[in-house]
Amino acid sequence: MAITFGTSLPSRGEMAGPEQLRSVAQRAEDLGYDHVWVSDHIVLPKKVDSFYPYAADGVATFRPNEPYYEPLAALNFIAGCTQRIRLGTHVLIIPYRNPVLTAKILSTLDVLSGGRVILGAGVGWMEEEFQAMGLDTYKERGAVTDEYLQLYKELWTKENPSFQGKYYQISDSGFEPKPVQKPHPPIWIGGHTGPAIRRAAKYGDGWMPIGLRPPAILDPEELGGKIARLRKLTVEAGRPEDAVSLTFSTGVFFDDSSGSSREMMHGRPEQIAADLRQYQDLGVSNFIIGLQGSTVP
């Protein structure tokens, strides 16, 4: 099983900027990384009561007055700065954008980059952001996401796309160019919840949860149980058991941790490698590593 490694780009916060994006992406490519990733928020309300699923207290640490680059625009920029490395969204919040326009941007990016796009897809968690964007679909965001993913595939793969859904309808329209990747750019579903796993089993080419960030621990034992659930649901959806590839996203902290109190992904390089092998043994073939630091190499 081939193993790939990727890392997140500084597309938000105090490190965000054109030179930083270019520098980290090119350095990652030079070092042999396989993919780079950008995340997605469009407007950050200053008062947020929605529960953030990747913090123990449910409070996100985003700062509304700091830059947060639009991910598809950022990836177009990165495509022009690199030659080989794959370009991913981690994750694109699918309900936020017109689905036909989104499919067009992704298809164009795939063509112009030579087939390097990975669509990491999620439903979103911040109700206040939906409201700020004039969207009333927060409570239906899962159903909207499922429908839009089906529409993307229709547009990307059919010569005469036609789609009649609850949230979007289209017929008798041309849609070109088609993506370079066939049948379409891989769709990796983000999230660790039951609905996310069901979505990956039915619509995804990959599943990409974030782990080791309370309350989403996803240590090897917990992740193994969720993978078994994913495989079962994939077969029930009429697909091969191994149709959905496995990705694990985590922060890595290099320090001198040792002994029984050492946390996973904390420690010396050989300890980190041993931790990663535990996930590899579960069938994980792609790792997205968040390297911790405050300066750009």
Locations of the language-model features?
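Active-site-adjacent structural elements that line small-molecule/cofactor binding pockets in enzymes
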Residues: 1-297
